[in-house]
Amino acid sequence: MNIVSDTLLENYRNQLGLDPDAALQKLRESFVRADSFNFYTSVAVITSSKIEGEPMEVDSYIKHKIQQIEYLPELTQKPNDLFRAYIYAKENRLTEDHFLHAHRLLTEHLLPGHWRGVYRRNPMVVMEHKTGRIQFEAAPAHLLETEMGRLWEDITELLHRDLSFEEIFYYASFIHLVFVCIHPFNDGNGRAARLLEKWFLSDKLGHVAWYIQSEQYYYQHVEAYYQNLNRLGMFYEQLDYLRAESFLKMLPEALAH
């Protein structure tokens, strides 16, 4: 593995406090209606969007998607773009090309066309949307191609491995974390990172993964979400992934939620 580390995996297993297989079976038994995917994807999309500062309320967006209630386009356009990206992910296997296409979809009303699905070429600092405080400095532009290449090599290897449930959740979270730290796009990185995590879970676990309300859990615990990201350090080349345990625990907590 190049960049996704298994150093914390043993501690993660010991501290999990959850049987992922049993929790997933409970999800399978609970969500049997034909419209379950649209409902839970609507929740995932709007809560992921609100982490990034989108103003539309969660219940309003659910009414928009499930009951076809109309709202002003400036409220619905960007969440709807992200919804289309989730639909695309559901219908396609996780590859770098497919992921870049998903980014093009989710940034249709966020970035100009020539920066959609394209890695940035400029420096990037990551800011917390509510306070405007700088969280950390993302990967320098001259390292982006190398770092994303390393990440996608790891993702591809993991997709071909036979992983336990604990390993699937561990690596999904770690991929999410590394992607956020690299922050490869000019915008849409947070939304894309949470979609990437869910997409990896779906490729490993099947359709039931789309019902895991990880985005909602991160939104409901957004201060902890940012604090756990900040634990690694301020500068990309000095990040300490041994401090990632608190972040890695959030996904299984979402499954138990």
Q: Which ranges hold each PLM region?
A:
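FIC/Doc superfamily catalytic core
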Residues: M1-H257
